[in-house]
């Protein structure tokens, strides 16, 4: 298996971590189906990855829809004839703004709460569900979910009453699937970023916000999207085949 061209689906592929993950996998010659809800950003991803040795196909889809998730898996198999792993990067806070963090409970509507779970948990669940038959048939597959440090503790300015429980659910989903699917040859792991240095973070929240998080790191710097992508790639690639059910914190030493 180590010598064949690997094929992956990356969801949220037009965002910061998702885009960096797609680039990292393509740089090693993999086939990647990049999935995102934004056609415009997918076009930018294609342009950005045009010179990389791997083959990129893109697909616009809302993965909170079961039909869409099933269609994405089917498209990957139709285009590439194979699927080795999925990076479930799609997620985040809904309609994020400068004052999104730690918003009062009274401002958390049920619709927003459910949309946050749909974006973070439903998408990962549905992709795993529809990839399982293919993975089981070949006796091999890898799923990497993206959780957050916000899943583990009360942390100021890292989420809200909808986002933090959703990311905790991603951890629970990861651990449950690893046990349920492991004897079928399917490995399921997750990464847990803290605040990730990206253009969007700096533009949305400003320098003072970034500096407060920077002060809490053990390394004196924040993780970058490329750091998160490297961790995801490690968990997708063959060198991590003995690992399942783990959550890897990629957060510059923040516990």
Question: Predicted regions: what is each one?
Answer:
Residues 133, 179-180, 241:
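Alpha-helical segment proximal to the catalytic Tyr-Lys
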Residues 28-45:
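Conserved glycine-rich Rossmann-like NAD(P)H-binding loop of the short-chain dehydrogenase/reductase
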Residues 140, 221-250:
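C-terminal substrate-recognition "lid" of short-chain dehydrogenase/reductases
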Residues 110, 144-169, 174-175, 179-183, ...:
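Catalytic loop of short-chain dehydrogenase/reductase
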Residues 84, 106-125, 140, 144, ...:
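Catalytic Tyr-X3-Lys loop
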Residues 182, 187, 243-245:
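Short, small/polar-rich loop/turn modules that mediate ligand/substrate recognition or access, typified
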Residues 97-114, 213:
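Substrate-binding pocket helix/loop in short-chain dehydrogenase/reductase
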Residues 2-33:
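Canonical Rossmann dinucleotide-binding motif of NAD(H)/NADP(H)-dependent dehydrogenases/reductases
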């Amino acid at each position: 298996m180590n010598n064949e061209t690997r094929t992956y689906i990356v969801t949220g592929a037009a965002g910061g971590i998702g885009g960096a993950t797609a680039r990292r996998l393509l740089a090693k010659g993999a086939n990647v189906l990049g999935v995102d809800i934004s056609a415009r950003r997918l076009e930018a991803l294609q342009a950005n990855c045009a010179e990389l040795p791997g083959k990129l196909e893109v697909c616009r889809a809302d993965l909170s829809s079961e039909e869409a998730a099933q269609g994405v898996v089917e498209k990957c198999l139709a285009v590439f004839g194979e699927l080795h792993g999925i990076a479930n990067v799609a997620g985040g806070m809904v309609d994020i703004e400068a004052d999104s963090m730690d918003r009062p409970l009274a401002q958390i509507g049920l619709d927003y709460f459910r949309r946050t779970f749909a974006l973070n948990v439903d998408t990962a669940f549905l992709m795993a569900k529809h990839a399982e038959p293919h993975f089981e048939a070949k006796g091999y597959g890898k799923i990497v979910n993206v959780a957050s440090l916000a899943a583990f503790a009360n942390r100021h300015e890292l989420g809200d009453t909808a986002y933090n429980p959703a990311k905790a659910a991603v951890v629970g989903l990861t651990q449950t699937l690893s046990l349920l699917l492991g004897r079928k040859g399917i490995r399921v792991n997750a990464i847990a970023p803290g605040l990730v240095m990206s253009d969007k973070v700096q533009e949305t929240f400003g320098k003072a916000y970034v500096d407060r998080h920077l002060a809490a790191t053990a390394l004196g710097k924040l993780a970058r999207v490329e750091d998160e992508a490297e961790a995801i790639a490690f968990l997708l690639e063959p060198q991590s085949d003995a690992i399942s059910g783990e959550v890897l914190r990629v957060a510059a030493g923040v516990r």
